[in-house]
Swiss-Prot record:
PTM annotation: Reversibly phosphorylated on serine residues during the M phase of the cell cycle. Phosphorylation is necessary for correct formation of mitotic spindles and chromosome separation during mitosis.
MF GO annotations: unfolded protein binding
Alphabetical UniProt keywords: Cell cycle, Cell division, Coiled coil, Cytoplasm, Cytoskeleton, Microtubule, Mitosis, Phosphoprotein
Descriptive protein name: Nuclear migration protein nudC
Organism, scientific name: Gallus gallus (Chicken)
Gene label: NUDC
Length: 341
C-alpha cells in the first residue's frame, strides 16, 4: 500500500542532506546534477530498457509536471503574501502620515468642550480625595513593625522607580512618541516613522535623503540640515527596511528590528525617552511571531503587568507554589520563624 499525500510530504525532505551534499559537489549546477541522476539510472538500473517504449519518458514528464505545478503554486502564494505585506505597510504608512499631518495642523493650545472640562475637573477632584484618604491612614502599632518595614522597603523601591521615570514621555497610541518634527510608532518586531515636510511643492525621491544603516538613520531634504541624523536605539535589518513618500509631503520610514523581544524607549540617541512601562502590549501583533518567541514575549508581558501591580512574576509564583506544596507535605515542620526571599 502506497503512502498517503500527507505521509509523502512529511518524508519528502528526508534525503535532503544526501542530495544537498551531492549538489555541492557539482560545480556545473543543476544541469550537471540532473545528468548525474540519469547517468546513474542508465548504468545501474533498467530504467531506460526495462519497460515498454515511452514508459520511462512518461514517468519523467509526469514527475516534472507534478513538481512544476507545486513550484508555481508556492511562487504564487509567496507573491501574494509579499503583496499583502507591502499593502499593509503602505496602509500603515499612509495612516501614520495622516496622523502626523493632523498633528502638525492642530493648534498647540486646544480649547476644551464643556464635557471635557467637566471630566477633567472630576479626575482632579478624585485624585484630591484619594490623596486625603492616604494622608488619613492611621499609623500601625509596634507589633506590625515587621510588616511595616517590608512595606516601607517596597514603597522606597517604588519611589526610586518613579524617580527614574520622571521626565519620560508617555507613549502615544502606537507605543512610540509624537515629537515636534516627526512621529514614530512600534510593535515588538518593527517600527514606523512619519516626517511631514512643510514645503510648497510635491516631494519626489530626488528631493529627499534617506540613509538607513544597521545602527544609524538619516532623513532630510537635499541641501538642508537633516531632520534626523543619529544612532538608532538598536540594530535594524537594513534589507527588510524601506521608505516612501506619502501625499507628496510626508516621508515614511519602515524599520525591521533585529531584536524582536524589546521595546525601544527612543528612536535615536538624541530623542527624549518614553516610559516603556506604560506601553500597551496589545497593540503589538503577537501573531506575527513564531510560537517559541511568542510564548517568551507573553511571559515577559505577564511579568511586566504583575510587577506594575506589585504582584509576583511567573517565576516568583512558581517558587511560592513549590514552597507551599513542600510545607503541606511536611506539616510537622515549623516554618513560622523562617525567612524567605
Amino acid at each position: 500500500m502506497g503512502l498517503s499525500a500527507e505521509e509523502a510530504a512529511e518524508q519528502e525532505d528526508r534525503f535532503d542532506g544526501i542530495l544537498l551534499a551531492m549538489a555541492q559537489q557539482h560545480q556545473g549546477g543543476v544541469c550537471e546534477l540532473v545528468n548525474t541522476f540519469f547517468s546513474f539510472l542508465r548504468r545501474k538500473t533498467d530504467f531506460f530498457t526495462g519497460g515498454e517504449d515511452g514508459v520511462a519518458e512518461k514517468l519523467i514528464t509526469d514527475s516534472f509536471n507534478h513538481h512544476n505545478k507545486l513550484a508555481q503554486k508556492e511562487r504564487k502564494e509567496k507573491k501574494a503574501r509579499q503583496e499583502a505585506e507591502r499593502r499593509e505597510k503602505a496602509e500603515r504608512a499612509a495612516k501614520l502620515a495622516k496622523e502626523a499631518k493632523q498633528e502638525a495642523n492642530e493648534p498647540r493650545i486646544k480649547e476644551l468642550t464643556d464635557e471635557e472640562a467637566e471630566r477633567l475637573q472630576l479626575e482632579i477632584d478624585q485624585k484630591k480625595e484619594a490623596q486625603k484618604e492616604v494622608n488619613n491612614v492611621p499609623v500601625k502599632s509596634s507589633e506590625d513593625d515587621g510588616d511595616s518595614s517590608d512595606s516601607n522597603k517596597q514603597e522606597t523601591d517604588d519611589e526610586e522607580k518613579d524617580e527614574n521615570d520622571k521626565g519620560k514621555l508617555k507613549p502615544n497610541a502606537g507605543n512610540g512618541a509624537d515629537l515636534p518634527n516627526y512621529r514614530w510608532t512600534q510593535t515588538l518586531s518593527e517600527l514606523d516613522l512619519a516626517i511631514p515636510f512643510k514645503v510648497t511643492f510635491r516631494l519626489k525621491g530626488k528631493d529627499v535623503v534617506v540613509d538607513i544603516q544597521r545602527r544609524r538613520l538619516r532623513v532630510g531634504l537635499k541641501g538642508h540640515p537633516p531632520v534626523i541624523d543619529g544612532e538608532l536605539f538598536n540594530e535594524v535589518k537594513v534589507e527588510e527596511s524601506s521608505w516612501l513618500i506619502e501625499d507628496g509631503k510626508t516621508v515614511t520610514v519602515h524599520l525591521e528590528k533585529i531584536n524582536k523581544m524589546e521595546w525601544w524607549n527612543k528612536l535615536v540617541s538624541t530623542d527624549p525617552e518614553i516610559n516603556t512601562k506604560k506601553i500597551n502590549p496589545e497593540n503589538s501583533k503577537l501573531s506575527d511571531l513564531d510560537s517559541e518567541t511568542r510564548s517568551m514575549v507573553e511571559k515577559m508581558m505577564y511579568d511586566q503587568r504583575q510587577k506594575s501591580m506589585g504582584l509576583p512574576t511567573s517565576d516568583e509564583q512558581k517558587k511560592q507554589d513549590i514552597l507551599k506544596k513542600f510545607m503541606e507535605q511536611h506539616p510537622e515542620m515549623d516554618f513560622s520563624k523562617a525567612k524567605f526571599n
